[in-house]
Amino acid sequence: MYSNLKSIGVVNYDNIDKYTLRQEGDTDILKIYFRKASRQFLAKSLKFKFPRQRKKISQDHGSSGFRNVSEIGSTLRYVLKELDSLTEHVKEEKELKVQVLEDLKHLESVVASKIKEIERKLEQM
């Protein structure tokens, strides 16, 4: 029924609560959140990374050059379509400033944890 979700290992279709999608470099990161069971403290989630599809398109009508663009891959596009049908996901438009601040906070936490990891490795040397 949901062949694309099944192909990435998602089989608990009825327990999917929501999902998020973000881009980091040349990768799209999909995180699927499941409804938490009564005895769980935190809800379970799965994280998937998909490479972005690269294309060359012609620039403007007058120029003869091409430019590289990246877009969401076809596999991820089909997975999102199935997720939308499961969650009836209605994504509200966020203001650009709010979204940039959220991305910045996420980046800060990723960099901070990576720095701590490198410092621990240096201490062990």
Swiss-Prot record:
It comes from the Bacteria. Coiled coil: none annotated. Disulfide bonds: none annotated. InterPro entries: UPF0325 (IPR020911). It holds the Pfam family DUF3461. Belongs to the UPF0325 family. This is UPF0325 protein Ping_0715.
